[in-house]
């Protein structure tokens, strides 16, 4: 009988550890208290001259299409086939006139507090990382959504 109780206790401890270990970085990245979470879906054609910067590895472009993010989306060409998309609003500021991110090479900088965030992983020294969006490449079309 003691053996059965001990097995149940060990199983319970394992379940508790497993559940607590499942806190996802994506949950933290996408539950930013400063940036509203709303749905959108936009497409861009990489063949258009406007998006020529994105045809090359490490290409970066701020797109500001209607409905795409709060202040637009910053797209980053990771390796020619994989792209990252981030909200173009400072992740650690209440949205204001100074909270649109500036592109600086492979970083974006928040003009409000001068904090830099890496486009490679979306992180900087502040509490909240950049809010990321989903990107799917189909031929020369990028679909960006949240």
Regions picked out by a protein language model, each given a short descriptive name:
Residues 7-15:
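Sec-dependent signal peptide recognition
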Residues 17-21:
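C-terminal motif of bacterial Sec signal peptides marking the signal peptidase cleavage site
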Residues 104-114, 124-137:
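Short cysteine/histidine-rich metal-coordination sites, predominantly Zn2+-binding motifs
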Residues 10, 22-26:
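Long, non-catalytic terminal segments
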Residues 1-6:
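N-terminal secretory signal peptides that target proteins for export/translocation
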Residues 25-105, 118-119, 134-146:
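N-terminal pre-ligand scaffold of iron-sulfur
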């Amino acid at each position: 009988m003691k053996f059965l109780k001990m097995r149940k206790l060990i199983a319970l401890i394992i379940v508790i550890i497993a559940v607590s270990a499942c806190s996802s970085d994506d949950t933290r990245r996408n539950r930013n208290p400063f940036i509203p979470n709303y749905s959108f879906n936009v497409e861009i054609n990489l063949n258009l001259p406007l998006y020529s910067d994105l045809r090359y590895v490490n290409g970066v472009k701020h797109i500001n299409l209607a409905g795409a993010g709060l202040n637009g989306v910053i797209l980053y060409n990771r390796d020619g086939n994989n792209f990252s998309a981030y909200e173009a609003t400072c992740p650690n500021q209440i949205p204001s006139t100074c909270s649109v991110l500036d592109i600086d090479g492979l970083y974006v900088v928040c003009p409000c507090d001068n904090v830099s965030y890496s486009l490679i992983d979306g992180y900087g020294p502040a509490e909240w990382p950049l809010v990321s969006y989903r990107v799917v490449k189909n031929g020369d079309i990028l679909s960006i959504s949240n």
